[in-house]
Amino acid sequence: MRVVLQRVKSASVTVEGETVASIGEGLLLLVGVGREDGEAEAGWLAEKVASLRIFGDEQGKMNLSVRDVGGEVLAVSQFTLLADTRKGNRPSFIRAADPERAEPLFEYFCERLREAGVSSVKTGVFGAVMDVALVNAGPVTIVLER
C-alpha cells in the first residue's frame, strides 16, 4: 500500500463538474492499494498518517500531527500509484489491487484514520475520474509505503 501525503491549506475533489468533497487545513492523501495488501498495511498507514508530525508548532518546528492541529483529511483512491514503469513506455498496473479488493481496503483505511482521532476524513468517489485541486502548504509532500 502506498500513500502520497501532501500538507495543504485546502483541497477539493470534483467529479463531472460537481464538487464532491473539500477540506481546509490538513492533508490530501493519494492512496494506492496493492494486490498483496491487507488490513495490517492499511491500519499501520492510517496510524502513521494520523501521528506524523508535519505541522508547525509555536516555534514553527514540525512537531504537530494532523490530529494535534484538528486538521482535516481528504483521501483519494489512486491505483496509478502502483504503476510499474521499468519496462517499456506504457505503465503496467498489474501490482494494483482489483477494485473489488481495493475499495473495501480503502474504506477500512479511512475508518482507521477516524479511529486514530482525525476529526474529519472525506473521500473522493472510488473508481471515478476526478479533478483534484489543492493549495500546498510548505510544500510538504511525503511518500509512505508498507
Curated annotation (Swiss-Prot):
Signal peptide: none annotated. CDD domains: Dtyr_deacylase. It is found in: Cytoplasm. A motif (Gly-cisPro motif, important for rejection of L-amino acids) lies at residues 138-139. Keywords: Cytoplasm, Hydrolase, RNA-binding, tRNA-binding. One of its GO terms (biological process) is D-amino acid catabolic process. The keyword RNA-binding applies. A Gly-cisPro motif from one monomer fits into the active site of the other monomer to allow specific chiral rejection of L-amino acids. Homodimer. An aminoacyl-tRNA editing enzyme that deacylates mischarged D-aminoacyl-tRNAs. Also deacylates mischarged glycyl-tRNA(Ala), protecting cells against glycine mischarging by AlaRS. Acts via tRNA-based rather than protein-based catalysis; rejects L-amino acids rather than detecting D-amino acids in the active site. By recycling D-aminoacyl-tRNA to D-amino acids and free tRNA molecules, this enzyme counteracts the toxicity associated with the formation of D-aminoacyl-tRNA entities in vivo and helps enforce protein L-homochirality. Belongs to the DTD family. This is D-aminoacyl-tRNA deacylase. It comes from Rubrobacter xylanophilus (strain DSM 9941 / JCM 11954 / NBRC 16129 / PRD-1). The lineage of its organism: Bacteria, Bacillati, Actinomycetota, Rubrobacteria, Rubrobacterales.
